[in-house]
Amino acid sequence: HYSSRRQRQMCIRDRSLLRETACNQMKSFIQEIPNGIYESSAWIDSDGVINEPLEIKLAITKKDEELEFDFSGSSKPCKGPMNSVLATTLSSVYLAMRHIFPEVPINGGAFIPLKVKRPFNTFLDAHYPRPVSGCAAEVSQRIAEAVFIALVEVLPSRVTAAPAGTSGNFALGGFNEDTNSDFVMYQLSGGGYGGNSDHDGLANGCSTIGISKAPPVEIMEQKFPVLYHHYALHDGSGGAGKQRGGFGLDYKLEILCENAQASFVMDHGRYGPQGAMGGLDGEVNVVNVQQSNKVYTPIHLSKEQDIQLTKGDTVHVKTPGGGGYG
């Protein structure tokens, strides 16, 4: 019993030490930033219901060893699924700071010096029954973009221009006559990363909130009734600059079953990822659906539900390039 109690005490002590170490490291990095207020804005294309952009307005106040993140003035709660719960808003800020200061260990102590002012009455503090299915994959990345753009000028060697900032969610469902069964295909897509002070942005990188991308097209074609016409880089999509943004992804697939439905939850279809330090914005996300003899572009550009497809129709997606730097 004494041994077990002693081990528990040591674990508690070690956990406290790890948290304290991470907290102190984050504080030391924050001191690289001069005291002051740093502002930015980032935009969601629309909420998928009302075709108007949503603004994320951010003011970061640096005072000594702390940063305060204030999203007051951001757009009001929306009707569509692009609201963010508070937990996602907080974690998106923490994620962005982890990208900026990757040396700091990941534990709760690292976030103690990061104070997020609760964004009451905005779409970044959603409450039931507001729909929130787009917050984790899409809104989170735009929050991170706002943090990057606010701090890039004061931390030019640590912060990049904005990355593609979308998970490229594409769902296709229907009935596969070859297997005599229903199917649902889900594809996540990469995009270009922002350029930085040292080099061009990464081409077709994973989304900034995860490490998932689509399986090889050969596997997708084996499992689902689709044929990829091409799967390549979105040539020239990176924003121009001293260090250009990385290229996004360009893919086109054909429907091989009799009927299917396509849905998209993406972003950056209206505004490209922001450039930094004078660099230009990256190219926007583009979705085109070829239905028989007509080309359909979603009303909300990057968001649409249950587009009806028949055999021979095609889906063509170009994901955003990263912003240019300098």
Protein language model regions, located:
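Single conserved hydrophobic/aromatic residue that forms the stacking wall/gate
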Residues: 1-12
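Amphipathic alpha-helical
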Residues: 13-37
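Helix-loop-helix junctions within predominantly alpha-helical proteins
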Residues: 27, 84-88, 92, 99-292, ...
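Flexible, glycine/threonine-enriched loop-and-boundary segments that flank and lead into catalytic domains
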Residues: 36-59, 233-236, 296-300
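Short beta-strand elements
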Residues: 54-73, 174-176, 181-190
